[in-house]
């Protein structure tokens, strides 16, 4: 189902506020706020790739995805001899454990036999003319006179029997884009969620700094800025609260960014419990950020037809 949309040329559909643009022929999704653009696309074999997030832009940013034969980066079975197509090198919207992407995953599940992994592919989308809410969880909302919208993209692995709704909320005038994920068991057996990040954000270039805020009791929010180097950097809390020791908020900043100018991406987790944020720079200098509920010792049982709702993340550029 699609709500509040009208067809335009080149099979493009746009909502009445121009916040959500969908080109069905290219399978291209573009989210616009007053000053920013976020874009993703369904690519070969049904994978949902991340193309762009930053200052407002026009057009198709698919050119950012380049395919090379990287040694020891495997490819999906469907690709056969086309070794240049590897999930290990493609910027993705919601990465999975166990499908050939060896970077830090956003999502990991275990079946009743103890086998980890899944392979999420695109199924459908839905556009709603209001900002989504999350039952029992805090979320950004619109005030009187403000317009909010939602894009829901459904991914599925029918073999494992899991479905994931990726929720994108847009509050256009405030330049806010929010993210959440709803994991649903569509199988006849129990499934165990080992990790379900609220957001996964890939950057095709890696020349960034990480800004975060450490501390202790009575001395919270101490500023720290460091280069994002190769490997994985993790911050978070296992204390049952977001804690004095680390704030569930980070900034990915360009090397030359300061208080007056430069590229900065603020990511805030709207949750007061244990959390995890991980930033990885990979073998090809791409950067990935995942943020969500702390996955250390985490195992959430999903009975058939039940679901897990990941708390919301708010993003600004």
Task: Cite the ranges covered by each PLM segment.
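Polysaccharide-binding surfaces and accessory modules of carbohydrate-active proteins
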Residues: 22-30, 34, 38, 48-280, ...
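Short, Lys/Arg-enriched N-terminal segments with co-localized hydrophobic residues
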Residues: 2-17
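Contiguous, structured surface segment used for ligand recognition
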Residues: 41
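Short, charged beta-turn/beta-strand-edge "cap" motif at the junction between a beta-strand
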Residues: 314-317
């Amino acid at each position: 189902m699609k709500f509040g949309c009208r067809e335009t040329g080149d099979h493009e559909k746009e909502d009445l506020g121009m916040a959500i643009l969908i080109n069905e022929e290219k399978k291209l999704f573009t989210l616009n706020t007053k000053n920013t653009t976020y874009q993703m696309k369904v690519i070969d074999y049904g994978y949902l790739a991340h193309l762009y997030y930053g200052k407002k832009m026009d057009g198709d940013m698919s050119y950012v995805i380049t395919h090379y034969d990287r040694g020891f980066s495997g490819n999906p079975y469907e690709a056969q001899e086309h070794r240049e197509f590897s999930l290990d090198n493609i910027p993705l919207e919601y990465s999975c454990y166990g499908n050939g992407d060896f970077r830090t995953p956003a999502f990991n599940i275990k079946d009743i036999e103890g086998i980890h992994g899944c392979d999420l592919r695109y199924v459908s989308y839905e556009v709603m003319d209001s900002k989504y809410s999350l039952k029992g969880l805090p979320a950004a909302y619109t005030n009187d006179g403000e317009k909010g919208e939602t894009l829901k993209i459904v991914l599925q692995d029918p073999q494992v029997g899991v479905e994931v709704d990726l929720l994108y909320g847009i509050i256009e005038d405030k330049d806010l884009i929010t993210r959440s994920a709803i994991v649903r068991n569509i199988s006849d057996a129990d499934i165990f969620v080992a990790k379900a990040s609220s957001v996964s954000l890939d950057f095709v270039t890696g020349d960034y700094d990480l800004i975060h805020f450490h501390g202790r009791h009575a001395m919270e929010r101490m500023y720290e800025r460091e280069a994002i180097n190769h490997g994985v950097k993790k911050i978070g809390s296992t204390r049952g609260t977001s804690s004095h020791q680390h704030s569930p908020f980070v900034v990915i900043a360009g090397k030359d960014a300061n208080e007056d100018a430069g590229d900065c991406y603020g990511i805030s987790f709207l949750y007061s419990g244990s959390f995890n944020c991980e930033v990885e720079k990979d073998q090809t200098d791409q950067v990935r950020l995942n943020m969500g509920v702390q996955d250390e010792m985490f195992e959430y049982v999903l009975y058939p037809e039940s679901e897990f709702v990941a708390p919301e993340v708010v993003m600004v550029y």
